[in-house]
């Protein structure tokens, strides 16, 4: 099926009249930036667009809470930033509480107000995001933050090396 009935499906489950389902689905595609692709098939969309369809479908029944399980895991950094911006707007403008499940510390730090660190099925640390990242108490979070800092440093070094090499080639 195309995107429009996919977004409307939760409304069908709630026995919403067909005309209202289509109207609501078309409306929801606008805020997620897909108003012009309602008649396309999911296979014709990029990964980021497919994620936006899933977000629109999740909003169909006006939830107060939305669970986002690895919402950016298969996306490039530009698309990840766009999806996080969209989720931030949903939280702020629609007053929807977001529960974000992610393995990415940068995603957690970027969008979450509070973080719960889970290790082996147990919460090992929980609190305000900035405080947790500034002063981690658990060994696992300390290690992950240190590893992320090393990785960030590597990316920075790679970018600097590439820039230096490009300048050498231009000379």
Regions found by a protein language model. Name each.
Residues 62:
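Conserved catalytic motifs of ABC-family nucleotide-binding domains
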Residues 66-69:
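Catalytic Walker B motif of ABC-type/P-loop ATPase nucleotide-binding domains
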Residues 108-110:
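A short, surface-exposed alpha-helical micro-motif characterized by mixed small hydrophobic
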Residues 134-171:
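C-terminal boundary and immediately downstream tail of ABC-type ATPase nucleotide-binding domains
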Residues 126-127:
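ABC ATPase "signature
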Residues 41-45, 49:
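Conserved ABC ATPase signature
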